[in-house]
Amino acid sequence: YLADYITKWVLGINPSSILEPSCGDGRFIQALFNNNSEKEKNITCFELIDSEADKSKYLLKSLGFNNFSVYSSDFLRWSVDNFKADQIEFEGIIGNPPFIRYQYLNEEFQESAKNVFDLLNFKFTKHTNSWVSFLISSLSFL
């Protein structure tokens, strides 16, 4: 229900480009289809786990979407690397970011989470959950 609700809300503004920063096996991709999304929308997805990213790629193809990219990589690291790239912008964001406490993230992800805060000039504490970094990072590309 969450995926359909959020996706319907985002599609209400008729975005031409959509970011899904933690796509997993494609629940929000399915929600795009369920909510009659135009197949030409530019959809950009990220997923850490290769097998889950592959599922999302397959789902996008099988549902008839034809303008998409699925990256099997860390969205937070990508966002840090591309933060000042003026040409990267999305009109809508869908997804359900990971809810992991900072101290349970591996060192690489801890560094990426902190870097997001630093780049956006937000105060960072080690009590910050991973979803916050995903949210503020995603919003910076709107």
Range-by-range predicted roles:
Residues 1-142:
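SAM-dependent methyltransferase catalytic region
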